[in-house]
Every structure is written in structure tokens, then in C-alpha cells.
Amino acid sequence: MYYYLHELKEYDIRIIGLDLKKEVIRHCNELSEKYGYEKLRFLEGDIADYTGVNKVDMVVTLHACDTATDYALAKAVGWDAKVILSVPCCQHELNRQIRNEVLEPVLRYGLLKERMAALITDGLRAQYLEREGYEAQILELSLIHI
């Protein structure tokens, strides 16, 4: 993303990446230094607690697990981000809570329950963004077509 926006499109950008895994952060910072990306840095930390900026133009979440996606979306809205791109990961929070007597014949199958929880969670996230004034789309990124 940095390469595309900074090198190809020639935007004057700064990108901060967050992750909880120290090894991931170390590796990403090594790559940033290797390629001379001076305004690309990675920090170990939780998006829910991050206070390093007051305003951003774009927020991207990539496989932010469980409620980390929700915290990132709330931060993006709070920062009044112009663009939000979110690729959520697992949705364990709703998966643990979803119970419905009528749907029990379907929900008893773990895979179907997991997918239903993911769809409902993504729908609720899209509605939250729309309620906050954003246009929202839900798309599926499938590796089958790549």
C-alpha cells in the first residue's frame, strides 16, 4: 500500500501499522528500512488503546481479530477518516453469544454458526458506519479468483 500510494501515486503520506505481535512488528519495520520507506513504521500495540494521532485520512484493517475490527472502526470514525477499508478476521464475540431456538437446527453446525456470526457482525458494522455518515459496502475477497 505504501509503495502504491507513495511511490506510484506520489502522495506525501505517512503510514503507521499496529499489531500485537512483537515479531510481526520487527519484521515489518525491517522491510520498511530495507526499502527506504521513511514514513512507514510499525508499532506494537492495541488499536483500542492507541492515541498516537488525532486525525487520519484513511484507516485500513487487515485481519484484525474479533473485536479489534470494531475498535478500529470506532477509532476511524472518531478520527473522521475519509476512507475506511476493513478486512475483518474472526468474529468470536458474536459466535459465542448467538443462540436462537428457531435457527438451532442450523446453528448446531459449527461452520454454519461461524459463517452466520460473521455475516451478522459484518452487517452490524456496515450499519454502524452508515449511521455515522459513511457509505458502506460489503464485499467478499476470494482467493479463488486471483
Task: Please name every model-derived segment.
Residues 144-146:
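Conserved small/polar residues in nucleotide/adenosyl-binding loops
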Residues 1-10:
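Conserved SAM-binding loop of SAM-dependent methyltransferases across substrates and taxa
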Residues 27-54:
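S-adenosyl-L-methionine
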Residues 119-132:
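Short alpha-helix
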Residues 135-142:
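Conserved S-adenosyl-L-methionine
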Residues 82-94:
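Conserved beta-strand signature within the Rossmann-like core of class I S-adenosyl-L-methionine
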Residues 14-19:
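Conserved SAM-binding motif I beta-strand of class I
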Residues 67-75:
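A short, conserved alpha-helix within the catalytic core of class I
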